[in-house]
Every structure is written in C-alpha cells, then in structure tokens.
C-alpha cells in the first residue's frame, strides 16, 4: 500500500510554488505518487471569469512539464471559486492522501484581519497537510526524507 497515492498541490503562481514542488518531487519519488496540480480561478464577476480560468490554466501548463519530465503521473485541475474551499473540495473529490502547499508566513495581525489560506484549509479538511514556508528557500528534491511509521 502506498502512503501517498495522490498528492494535491494548490499553486498560487508565486515563488513559494517552487519550494513546495521540490518537496512534492521527493515524496512522489519515494511513494510513486500521482501529483495533482490545482490552480483556483478566483473571480468576482462573470466578466473576469474567462480571463482568470485562462490564467489558471497557463500556470498549470508551465508547471506540469517539470514533473512529467521526471516521469510522474500528473493531472491538472482548474478550480473555480474561493481558493481554500475549492482546495478542500478537490482533495475530497479526488481522494487525495496529502495536500502540499506553500504558506507565505504573514504575521499574526494580517492572519487575524484577512485570514490565512493555509489556516482555512487546515480547519476544513481531515487530509494531512504539508506546509512549506515561502522563506524556507528551495530545498533540493533529494534532501526531503519522509519518515513513515509502518
């Protein structure tokens, strides 16, 4: 049995995506996981919907070849709506075993005022989370060693 059969990776199009992907590569190699890349198109009006969906797909189209080139099974999904809600919904719908995502490490005041994407996901799902800080630097894929209790 594979511990992480499917890893969901919500992308926000910022440099933290690279750090998250390095960790995901190591885990996917260790567990022969399918990687599901998610970009949520968050739009406020119908007029911006097509543009946001196209932008989301463009982000996925830039990232997927990096993983496919290493031989991973990769699926891309464009979500629609509120990013945290859609991430939780997709994780459940796609039967994911792990959500690997970046966190920008904003201060406590900003989290209280605006909320935190990672916090909202954490409170809304039972799927395990791997959180990678934006300022953690890009870890080489070979430097991540998953510890597993058998």
Residue ranges and their predicted role:
Residues 1-2, 16, 65-99, 136-150:
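Structural beta-alpha unit
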Residues 2-50, 149-150:
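Small/aliphatic-rich secondary-structure junction motif
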Residues 26, 90-140, 146-150:
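Gly/Ser-rich helix-loop-strand patches that form or flank binding pockets
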Residues 31-34, 72, 96, 127:
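Short glycine/serine/threonine/alanine-rich loop segments
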Residues 36, 75, 130:
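Conserved beta-strand positions in the Rossmann-like core of class I SAM-dependent methyltransferases
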Residues 47-52, 111-113:
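Short, solvent-exposed loop/turn segments at secondary-structure boundaries
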Residues 50-61:
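Short, surface-exposed alpha-helical segments at coil->helix boundaries
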